[in-house]
Amino acid sequence: MKQKIIFFLVSSLVFSALIILGALRLFNNYETVIILGMSIGFLFGLLITLIMIYIHSSYLRKAGLNKTGLSVVNSIEIEATGNKEEVIALCIETIRSVKKSELGLVNKNKGLLTVNVGVNWRTWGDSIQFEVKAITDHKCNVVITSRPTLRTTLIDLGKNLDNVIKITNDLKSKAQIKVLNNNCNITET
C-alpha cells in the first residue's frame, strides 16, 4: 500500500507542476493556476495509480498469488543437494529460464553470481543475485534475490517475483531442493 501512495503522490505532484508551469502563460491569476494545476494533477495521479493497481492485481491473479508482502525486491532461500561447484553450475544453467538474462559477476570462491536482465515493458531491467553457501559436502544453501536495476522503482508489476518463480521451478526440475525461507510468498508449485 505504501508503494501505491508514494506512486500516487509522485505522479500527482509531477503532473501538477507541469500543468502549473504550462498554464502560467495563459492566466494572469496565480491562485487560479495553482488550484487548476493541483486539481488536474490530483485527478491524473489518481487515474494513473488506479490503472497501475489494476494491471498489478491482474498479474498477481494470473500467477495465482496473493498481495500480502509483495515487494519489488523478492528473495527465497533454498537448500539444494550437491557440492558447491555443482550447485553453482545448476544456478548458471537456470539463468536461461529468464528472458534477456546475461551472466555478470561470478565469484565461485565466495559463491556469488550476479545476473543482469534486460529492459522490458514492466521494468528498466533487473538484477538477480545467487548466494551459494556450502552446509555439508553434499548440501548447499542458496539465496536467490531479484530486484529492479533502477533502485527507485516502486511497482514492477510482479516481474521480479516472476524471475524468482521461474528460477526456483527450473532448479526444482534439475535438482532436489527444499525451501527454507520464502520471503516472497511463493506457494509450492
Give the location of each predicted region.
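Ser/Thr-rich, low-complexity intrinsically disordered terminal regions
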Residues: 2-5, 19-189
